Amino acid sequence: MLLEFDADQRLWQETVRDAVGKQCPPALVRGVAEDGVDPTPVWKAYVEHGWTEMNDPQTAVELAIVLEELGRATDPTPFLATMSQFAPLAADRFDSQASGTAVYRGVTAHRDEDAWGLDGTAKHVLDGDRAEWLAVVTDAAVFIVSADEVAGQVSRRRSAVFDPVLHVADLTFDGVRVPDTARVSVDVERARHIALMGMAMTMVGACQRILDLVLEHVRSRHQFGVPIGSFQAVQHKAADMHVAVERARALAYYAALTIAGDDPRRRLAAAMAKAAAGECQSLVFRHGLQLFGAMGFTWENDLQFALKRAKAGELMLGGAAEHRAMITEEYRAAQL
């Protein structure tokens, strides 16, 4: 893929979009939020489709296509955490049938005779309360831990977040002993680039969903006998939303391309993707609510799910300001 999808990628996108539309419709998302419907069958469907087998960095673009569509659908399964955070760290120990997540900060490791001891508290771990496997990143090494095996030693408390179908949890490790065989040798930095790309791609999908709903609304909502979409002020805001989404999408796919090609620019590309996605959600969030008016604030409107997913993405793995600062430091260092 250079500047646009080739025929195979377009077919892949259409296939994924069709499958997501059937497996994860808005009614299911609302059912999960309101009635606690179990999304496990949806996760199993993704596994059966083979989507969890895209754990090779070379398939980053294909994975990005899936993540964008799942972001658009406000996917309630652990796919994002599993494929963009856990799989890159698990390397050859990744099981495509099981869910997982990554613990990036807050946990330390120390030698405990012939094993290792893990201590500390990790805050706001995506799917930390329901993942079957944990990839724990410490200064000493990365450890792949079965959640079942340490169930009595790790406290997993789900946090209350504004996205009703998103699972975020605090994990506390108190002297958890893991064998030396749990250690893996993996490029943590590259894994983090994939995580950033994945989160950015999900945010792009959510922002596209917001834009789609807004365009549908301004075409059907009438004032003074005409659709409100015919007013120039409304058109300007919709155009700004479209430009922001396209910019964020381009940078997110650029990040996926650099990851797939093992390009040394992937660190900057991942940071630019996350920064652009954060800026995009800010603009799309504000304009989307304004163009919808009071209806956009109601629980009955599906707009809320996409808004919350986009905003939640900004709050994880560093916001736009943090990544812009990193990009600035990189360029300043290069000029010295």
Task: Say what each PLM segment does.
Residues 59, 63-66, 75-88, 92:
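Hydrophobic alpha-helical segments that drive targeting, anchoring, or assembly
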Residues 78-80, 88-208, 212, 216:
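FAD-binding core of flavoproteins
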